[in-house]
Amino acid sequence: MNETPAVPPSPEVEGSLNEQISHRRRILAVLDAMKDGRALLSARIENQRGYFNTTLLKIDAEKGYVFLDELAPADGHEKIAVGQTLHLYGFYNNLPAHFAIEVIHVGEHEGIAFYAGPLPKLIHYQQKRAHFRAYVGLGKELKVRLRKGDGAQISGRLQDISLGGFGALMPADSVFEDLEIVEVEALELPDHHAIACSAEIRHSHPTQGRVHIGARFTQLAPQAERQLLQAIVELEREQLRKQSRD
């Protein structure tokens, strides 16, 4: 199974999935893309708490069935039964999507459980690219190092991040101009990797002995965008785990 973590959207994100795919051919195209891309889905059993990981194993377009891999962790499989509805969350073209499947069969193949259900009648998704913001927890120190146009280097702490940009806390004596272009020499991600790119300062203001900046990415390579997406998912997953403990 793909190791990239799946995560359900926050209520704000889920509420913004106001576009619908209802045409059968388009639904099949989306599901096939998720299956071929080995997209990891986050699954929630209706009327139950908790989220589990699964993937699409097979799409039977002729008979109109969808087959899902065994839920992980294992306690998810123990909770599922025929007649229940699985709500599934994932990404299609890097945009969040949601659909539901009624489980009509629970089977096993080579020691691994699977679930079958009819094709969903609707897929909800965000049609336009949305920059969902993930926040960096206080216990996690992710650094960002910027180089200004005059060559000065300034390092600070990453506070939030999205596919569109980031927020950071910089030293109190930092000076930034709105619309100033800076080089992001290193922006640390939760997986200990760092990306480099260019960014435009959108705003800056003093706060609690620091300077908070908001920046928009201006040049972001496809590989860096994929790394960012994975980082955002991981940060949201950590926040969900924290909320469940609280």
Curated annotation (Swiss-Prot):
Boundaries of every PilZ domain copy: 128-232
Keywords of the record: Bacterial flagellum, c-di-GMP, Nucleotide-binding
GO biological-process terms attached to the record: bacterial-type flagellum-dependent cell motility; regulation of bacterial-type flagellum-dependent cell motility by regulation of motor speed
Keyword presence, Phosphoprotein: no
GO MF annotations in UniProt: cyclic-di-GMP binding
Compartments where found: Bacterial flagellum basal body
Gene3D superfamilies according to UniProt: Electron Transport, Fmn-binding Protein, Chain A, predicted glycosyltransferase like domains
Organism domain of life: Bacteria
Keyword Nucleotide-binding: yes
GO CC term, one of those recorded: bacterial-type flagellum basal body
InterPro entries listed in its UniProt record: PilZ_domain (IPR009875), Split_barrel_FMN-bd (IPR012349), T3SS_YcgR (IPR023787), T3SS_YcgR_PilZN (IPR009926)
Function: Acts as a flagellar brake, regulating swimming and swarming in a bis-(3'-5') cyclic diguanylic acid (c-di-GMP)-dependent manner. Binds 1 c-di-GMP dimer per subunit. Increasing levels of c-di-GMP lead to decreased motility.
Self-association state and partner proteins as the record states: Monomer. Interacts with the flagellar basal bodies.
Protein family according to the UniProt entry: Belongs to the YcgR family.
Name of the protein in question: Flagellar brake protein YcgR
Organism, as annotated: Thioalkalivibrio sulfidiphilus (strain HL-EbGR7)
Lineage, top ranks: Bacteria, Pseudomonadati, Pseudomonadota, Gammaproteobacteria, Chromatiales
